Structures are given as C-alpha cells and as structure tokens.
C-alpha cells in the first residue's frame, strides 16, 4: 500500500473533542445544554445498536440525550405526535428519526414533519433545497464528514475534479453539492453511467457511495487521487469460520490503495464521522436557535 490512510476514527475523535469543548462553553457562558432526541420505531437490531451508540456519544460530549422507543406497530398519527412534541420542546435542538421505518409508515412524511432547524440529519426537503442553492442549512452527516476529511487532507479543494459514484438523496446528491460549494468540478456518476471507469479515472477526488461491494477497482483510479469510500457492505468470510462475515467498502481497498494518494478504510474511515457530525450538527442547531456564533469548522 502506497496511499496515505485517512483515519476516520482519529478524525472523529477530534471532532467530538471540538464539540465537547463548545458544549462546555455553552453551559458556562450561557447556561445552555444542547439536546438531541432520537426516535426509534420497532426492534431492528442494527438500528438499536446505532441508537445506543448515538446516545452514548451524545452524553460523553456533555449534551442532553433523549430516546423515544416506540413499538413496531405504532401508528403514523402517534409517531407524528411524538415528533410534534419534540419540535415544541425548547430543550431539544436536534431531532433524529432512525431509519428505516416499518413499512406502514411514510418516511418522507415523517422526516418532513421535523422542524427544519432541528433536522440534524439534514433530510428535510427545506434543508435539501437550502443546500442545493448554497444557503445555510443543516447538512447531512455522512457527506459533511467526507467534506471535513477532504478539507483536512487537502486544505483547499479549489478547482479539483471530483467524481461522486452514487446518486442517493442521503449521500450522493448532497456530497456533490458540498463539493461544488468548495469550488470543485463535480461529476455525479452511478452504476449505469456509460464508460464509468473512464469517468472515474479523470478524478482527483473519488467519493464511492454506490452500495455495491468492491465495485471500484484500482485500475479505475487516477494515480495520486484521493479516494473516500462511503460503502459499508457485509460479505461472507468462511476463512474466519462458519457464519462469519467481513466488512468491505464500495472500492477494492488493496488495489485502490496501491494507486491512490490517500484513501479511507472500511471499517474505520467514513463511518465514525457520521455520528461525530450528528453531534456537530446538534451544537450548530443549538447555537442558531439561541442566536449565538456557530462553532468554527463543524459545518460546511
């Protein structure tokens, strides 16, 4: 491997330390404690693990953590009532409804019922529109984490060619908007892009967020390019024992690392940044709600 490893765990720890420092100042100078509420519907094991991790990290940085755990058969009316209650609570500055929701619930309706200024996931249609027009918004956590790591590694992204492989509303599209905002020349590609390999080879920055394990091989990467791997895919790993699995990204790590200038690993790359940026967004939302200066370096 010749590429520099971009350590997401270490970077996320730095972000959490910045958040904790700002929370301490908010308490000492203004008597304000940022509050994050997470709503979980049902018993999805992966969601439960994720919500526990969010709650733990929220309290570790000194913020108020609130969890609402609802039964899987909770009605849409009852779920919307919980969100409405949180919208009106002045001690709650960030609201997150854990996805996916059970099939009988309308995810778009629920997400858009969250007050935009408390939408720390950045999924509300108002925040999507604000981001797309270059205005102040709540920025989706995973793309924000990617941008933070790119800025840290490169300094300025001015004039760089960037390819985002993936067009999801959660990662691909907002990632492209953020890169445009930093004056990159941006191409959004996807699994059906013609001559995808040639498109990717032109990029100084490749962000892979297509949801296909090890789809991007090393011979697609321009020598010296920076590769940000957003993918999290679980593959069978019989070499580890019966029923064992391993996590891989959307790029073939070994072949890409031999060519790239810098690369994020999976696990330990983008993943840890997602919750760190959720905490950062909550502090940002708290400052905006109280007319205070936003913490520097914690948003786009």
Curated annotation (Swiss-Prot):
Its EC number is 1.5.1.5, 3.5.4.9. Keywords: Amino-acid biosynthesis, Histidine biosynthesis, Hydrolase, Methionine biosynthesis, Multifunctional enzyme, NADP, One-carbon metabolism, Oxidoreductase, Purine biosynthesis. It catalyses: (6R)-5,10-methylene-5,6,7,8-tetrahydrofolate + NADP(+) = (6R)-5,10-methenyltetrahydrofolate + NADPH; (6R)-5,10-methenyltetrahydrofolate + H2O = (6R)-10-formyltetrahydrofolate + H(+). One of its GO terms (molecular function) is methylenetetrahydrofolate dehydrogenase (NADP+) activity. One of its GO terms (cellular component) is cytosol. Pfam families: THF_DHG_CYH, THF_DHG_CYH_C. Gene3D superfamilies: Leucine Dehydrogenase, chain A, domain 1, NAD(P)-binding Rossmann-like Domain. One of its GO terms (biological process) is tetrahydrofolate interconversion. NADP(+) binds at residues 166-168, 191, 232. It comes from the Bacteria. Pathway: One-carbon metabolism; tetrahydrofolate interconversion. Belongs to the tetrahydrofolate dehydrogenase/cyclohydrolase family. PANTHER family: C-1-TETRAHYDROFOLATE SYNTHASE, CYTOPLASMIC, C-1-TETRAHYDROFOLATE SYNTHASE, CYTOPLASMIC-RELATED. Homodimer. Catalyzes the oxidation of 5,10-methylenetetrahydrofolate to 5,10-methenyltetrahydrofolate and then the hydrolysis of 5,10-methenyltetrahydrofolate to 10-formyltetrahydrofolate. This is Bifunctional protein FolD 1. It comes from Roseobacter denitrificans (strain ATCC 33942 / OCh 114) (Erythrobacter sp. (strain OCh 114)). The gene is folD1.
């Amino acid at each position: 491997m010749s590429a520099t490893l971009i350590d997401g765990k270490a970077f996320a720890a730095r972000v959490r330390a910045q958040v904790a420092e700002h929370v301490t100042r908010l308490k000492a100078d203004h008597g304000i404690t940022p509050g994050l509420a997470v709503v979980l519907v049902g018993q999805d094991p992966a969601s439960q693990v994720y919500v526990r991790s969010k709650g733990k990290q929220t309290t570790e940085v000194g913020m108020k953590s609130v969890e609402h755990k609802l039964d899987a058969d909770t009605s849409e009316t009852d779920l919307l009532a919980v969100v409405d209650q949180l919208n009106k609570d002045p001690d709650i500055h960030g609201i997150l409804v854990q996805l996916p929701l059970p099939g009988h619930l309308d995810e778009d309706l629920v997400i858009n019922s969250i007050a935009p200024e408390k939408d720390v996931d950045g999924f509300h249609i108002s925040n999507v529109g604000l981001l797309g027009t270059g205005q102040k918004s709540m920025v989706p956590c995973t793309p924000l984490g990617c941008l933070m790591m790119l800025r840290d590694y490169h300094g300025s992204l001015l004039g760089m060619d960037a390819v985002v492989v993936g067009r999801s509303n959660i990662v691909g599209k907002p990632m492209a908007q953020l890169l445009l905002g930093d004056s990159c020349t941006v191409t959004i590609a996807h699994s059906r892009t013609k001559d995808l390999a040639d498109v990717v080879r032109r990029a100084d920055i490749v962000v892979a967020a297509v949801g296909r394990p090890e789809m991007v091989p090393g011979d697609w990467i321009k020598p010296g390019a920076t590769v940000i791997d957003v993918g999290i895919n679980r593959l069978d790993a019989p070499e580890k024992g019966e029923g064992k699995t391993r996590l891989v990204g959307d790029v073939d790590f070994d072949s890409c690392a031999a060519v790239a200038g810098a690369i994020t690993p999976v696990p330990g790359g983008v993943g840890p940044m997602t919750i760190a940026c959720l905490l950062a967004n909550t502090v940002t939302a708290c400052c905006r709600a109280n007319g205070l200066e936003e913490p520097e370096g914690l948003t786009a």
